[in-house]
Amino acid sequence: MLDTLRHVIEAHGGLENWNQHNALSVDLVIGGMLWGLKGQAGKLERTTVTVGLGKEWASHQPFGPDNRRTRFSPDRVAIEDAHGKVIEELAAPRASFAGHALETPWTEPQLAYFAGYAMWTYLNLPFLALHEGVEVEELPIWHENGEAWRPLRLTFSDTIATHSKVQTIYAGDDGLLRRHDYAVEIAGDSPAAHYLGKYVTVDGIKFPTERRVYVAGPDGKPMPDLMTVSIDLSNYRFV
């Protein structure tokens, strides 16, 4: 394991502690310009997500009206009513985004797919870097906000549903993640600069309670007037 990655893993609570758990739930308040662009404003404004830790799956509830919920896995996504009856489903969901740009509207199953893989990725980091389908490379020091951050480039195998094959996470001197860069492949490879902070500790594991995602310019700097997603997270609990 790279020394920087080891420092990051320990700063977030350690692998031994993390491996004691199988799933995680957290309450979300979600905003940003993305949802309106996709024709899905308000569907996930206030919701709870539960994700697998390691195995890739996720569920949001409520999802829109009537306390509906989603079921996400890389090869299938479904929307269910409050009693578990399937209302709509989509197999091989990623293929349905062919030709999409940032402004292309999404169907509800497409929204559920995006939200599912995104939150699974976010909540499993940085431990996801140790997944057998992820390769890690250390990059040169990155200076931002008067700090020197240590970047790690993550290259994902095709078996993992996530934003893009190559992503970068940045850790501060304390080992906690500050930033996460990726291109949203299913939205025309839109480049994103994702900032996270205001950490809390839950059963020995550190989690951010604030996430802000901006369109990234050609120089890698965020465009502050183009905040695509905001997420406030509370009431983390292992389940």
Show which residues each predicted segment covers.
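Intrinsically disordered terminal and processing segments
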Residues: 15, 65, 127-139, 223-239
